[in-house]
């Protein structure tokens, strides 16, 4: 399992006009079951690199492959199907405010996969309880408490057992009672072969999870660098 490369960013230089990332080549390999922690002081750079991993950013050079397929070579419906294998916590929310949070949680998987709604709903309810929600929230995002909306974001990111999990600053500004349910679920996901990339402003926030961390990296103006921890 550990030899399977899930995500391969190979000398990828993002388009200067379309990305907030510094205009330098990026290299990263994530194998099944691995976890990479990326430290950066810029939330904007975190989102931009997560977009690069998801095949959203146009490249001037290099390639980004997910599960062996190069994003730039894919068209619909294969493109949407592959993005359905990615779970993500967005640091700016990524909620559609006209819909209840429950619909926001289920909608990405319903759009990107052929999973039955009753199966997804059952899994979503289980995840809600794990993260401290009594059930699927029926309020709209603007009417949710920030901490409960963050719990819902964790549920959405893990729904459908994604192969790649991208977490943009999941702990900053939230209480520690969210740490351990997420650590537990990430540990389970890695054991099943998922790859995890987590963005943080401080490596120290991940000390409790360091035994499952494969690489520590830093994202700066000069690009991605490997760090020793």
Question: How would you describe each model-predicted region?
Answer:
Residues 92, 98-111, 123:
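Q-loop/switch helix immediately C-terminal to the Walker
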Residues 71-87:
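ABC ATPase NBD coupling module
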Residues 54:
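Helix-to-loop junction immediately C-terminal to a conserved catalytic motif
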Residues 62-72:
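Conserved ABC transporter NBD signature motif
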Residues 140-148:
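Conserved ABC ATPase signature
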């Amino acid at each position: 399992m550990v030899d399977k490369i899930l995500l391969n960013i190979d000398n990828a230089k993002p388009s200067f006009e379309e990305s907030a990332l510094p205009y330098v080549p990026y290299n990263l390999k994530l194998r099944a079951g691995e976890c990479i922690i990326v430290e950066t002081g810029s939330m904007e750079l975190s989102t931009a690199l997560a977009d690069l991993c998801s095949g959203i950013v146009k490249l001037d050079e290099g390639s980004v492959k997910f599960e062996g397929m190069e994003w730039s070579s894919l068209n619909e419906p294969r493109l949407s199907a592959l993005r359905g294998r990615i779970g993500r916590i967005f640091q700016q929310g990524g909620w559609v405010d006209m819909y209840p949070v429950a619909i926001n949680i289920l909608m990405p998987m319903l759009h990107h996969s052929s999973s039955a709604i009753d199966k997804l709903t059952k899994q979503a309810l289980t995840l809600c309880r794990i993260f401290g929600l009594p059930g699927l929230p029926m309020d709209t995002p603007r009417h949710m408490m920030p901490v409960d909306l963050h719990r819902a974001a964790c549920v959405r990111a893990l729904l459908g057992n994604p192969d790649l999990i991208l977490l943009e600053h999941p702990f900053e500004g939230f209480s520690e009672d969210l740490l351990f349910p997420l650590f537990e679920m990430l540990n389970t996901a890695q054991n099943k072969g998922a790859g995890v990339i987590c963005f943080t402003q401080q490596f120290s926030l991940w000390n409790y999870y360091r035994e499952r961390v494969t690489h520590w990296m830093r994202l700066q103006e000069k690009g991605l660098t490997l760090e020793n921890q």
